[in-house]
Amino acid sequence: MPIRVGVIGAGVMGADHIRNLSTTIGGAKVTFVADLDAGRAAAAAPPSARITTDPTELINSSDVDAVVVASHDSTHAGLVLECFEAMTPVLCEKPLAPTLLESLEVVAADADIVAATGASLLSLGFMRRFDPGYVALRQAVQGRVQGEPLMVHCVSRNAAAGPGTTSELAITNSAIHELDIIPWLLGSPVTEVSWQAGKQTSRAEPGLQDPSFMTLRTADGTLTTLELYLNAQYGYTTRCEVVSEQGTTSLQESSLLGIEQDGTRQAVIPADWRPRFADAYRLQLQAWISALAGGEAPSLAGAQDGLNASLVAQAMIQSLHSDGTTTKVSYS
């Protein structure tokens, strides 16, 4: 019997998850879709799935074995807690919650469930952990193929920031991927951070300083830099280079399409992140479904990973509001 999945949120990410679960993920069936826009839910859902505008109805439905939360960031914590009350496994898109207080509430509830049952119900959608490029990079780093890592350089550029994006949201919604992946990559927690603004692009809305430049230092002493540019116009790019004692290792732009025509050679850059991380999303979903079907603990990021990223984000926001002062990350 397939795992019957209910998906909350039928926007860009939710629709992609529905499509993957319905076409490329083995052992899954989308049986219920919830979105505040009933028309959008109907457009994204497979023909046999039920539709609702009430996520609580979906979570408590006898037609649902597991839930994917792909709705607005502000809804994540509340919906995850509802899934806990229903004792339903849930895969929540990042971030765990937009505020530290909400993250702490979810982690505490998750800990209670683990204490009572021996297993967590929560998986968190930090999909880069399943990207083949990042996986290979991590294997090289942790295998010390080029000796000790010394520095890491990251670049994350988007064509255009979403409406209403602020400098704080740029950290909690976009940079949050690097705040999670760097300690995962290096096997060492982030201990201090700093944030600086670049020269302001004319395309940034009020409240957003763009581009920005961040630093993260991990407990092993490695320094990571991150350039975050949300209004780069030309498309989506993510880069990561690890500088080690005996060489460098970097991600390849595997999603670029090469075109040779009329005496020219071109590389077509994707408009957003989805083509670049399509494999990561599929692999993450399959790992989650396979674990649920086998009665095993999913290998995805969990509640504590989400809290750790939130704590680093909080320190980064504090640096943002303190003229770029280097700020310690407190895990206590």
Swiss-Prot record:
Q: What InterPro entries does the annotation carry?
A: Gfo/Idh/MocA-like_OxRdtase_C (IPR004104), Gfo/Idh/MocA-like_OxRdtase_N (IPR000683), MI/DCI_dehydrogenase (IPR023794), NAD(P)-bd_dom_sf (IPR036291)
**Is the keyword NAD assigned to this protein?**
yes
Source species, domain of life:
Bacteria
Q: Which protein family is named in the record?
A: Belongs to the Gfo/Idh/MocA family.
State its Enzyme Commission number(s).
Answer: 1.1.1.18
What is known about its subunit structure? Answer: Homotetramer.
User: What stretch or stretches form a coiled coil here?
Assistant: none
Question: What does the record give under GO molecular function?
Answer: inositol 2-dehydrogenase (NAD+) activity; nucleotide binding
Q: What role does it play?
A: Involved in the oxidation of myo-inositol (MI) to 2-keto-myo-inositol (2KMI or 2-inosose).
Q: Which reaction does it catalyse?
A: myo-inositol + NAD(+) = scyllo-inosose + NADH + H(+)
> In Gene Ontology terms, what is a biological process of this protein?
inositol catabolic process
Is this entry keyworded Nucleotide-binding?
no
Instruction: Recite the UniProt keywords alphabetically.
Output: NAD, Oxidoreductase
Q: Enumerate the SUPFAM superfamilies for this protein.
A: Glyceraldehyde-3-phosphate dehydrogenase-like, C-terminal domain (SSF55347), NAD(P)-binding Rossmann-fold domains (SSF51735)
**Which Pfam family is one of this chain's hits?**
GFO_IDH_MocA_C
Q: What is this protein called?
A: Inositol 2-dehydrogenase 2
